[in-house]
Amino acid sequence: CYLGQTYLNGASYQGRLNETTQTGAELIGDDSSDGDAEMIVMVIDALKSTGLQEFQVELGQVEFYRGLVEEAGMDEETSNQLQELIENKNYFGVEELLTEQTMPEEQKRVFLKLPELFGDIEKIRLARSMTANKRSLQAIDRLERVQEILDSYGLGDYVSYDLGMLSKYSYYTGIIFKAYTYGTGEYLVTGGRYDKLLVQFGKNTPAVGFAIVVERLMLALSRQRIVTKVNRVEQMVLYEPGARTKAVGLAKHFRTEGQAVQLI
């Protein structure tokens, strides 16, 4: 887990802060769909703990798109252009770009459908019926497994799907997700799997994680008039180095009475 400042290299004059506070968590060394699900459970629990109830976590899978691109033999430049159009739900732009490409009409139809593949789990099942590409189907398998795990936690209703959500960050290698609520026009949480990123820092191990944008979360809480309970210190026990045992005993006494205690 971590908490710190992040600096974004975004476009100018958009009314957005270039410096934000983020808090989040990473699960390192686990490449399973169970690990994906655990991170999403943590996101949901974290948002609920602030008092939010009406929010959605949108799940995507970059490998579904990459499998289709690989099968179509599309070059990187065209793939990046198409990816941006799909993510922006620019149907006409997608159609225009595909008319310039040499590929079977069946493959073109799948790409044209991608901007529409958002909603509940039925959209994922529809996507499965649209392709026989092994890489893409493995991506669908992982999403369905994540849904099963979330359902077992009783949290399945908090998630939806968007196979047209394709991150501009190429280091993502599997599931990606963003959390939204009303009161802010931006995502509160962003995250995903990045199994090949840490090798650039000397550690070849899989990882999945997320970041909560604290300013956006606070804005949403304010606009929804949600007051978050803060645990304040009610008792402060000051002690000299040789009196630790006595101080700890006194702190335990206060805590059994339900009081928050800080030892100094």
Describe these PLM feature segments.
Residues 2-52, 98-264:
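Positively charged, Gly/Ser-enriched RNA/tRNA-binding surfaces
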Residues 18-23, 59-67:
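Short, conserved phosphate-binding/catalytic loop or strand-edge motifs used
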Residues 50, 64-65, 78:
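Extended alpha-helical scaffolds
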Residues 54-64, 82, 160-164:
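Short, surface-exposed recognition loops or helix-turn segments adjacent to catalytic cores
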Residues 61, 89-90, 120:
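Short, solvent-exposed helix-helix connector turns and helix-capping sites enriched
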Residues 68-69, 73, 118:
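Active-site-proximal loop/short-helix segments
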Residues 73-96, 103, 155, 181:
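Acidic, His- and aromatic-enriched active-site or binding-groove loops in soluble protein domains
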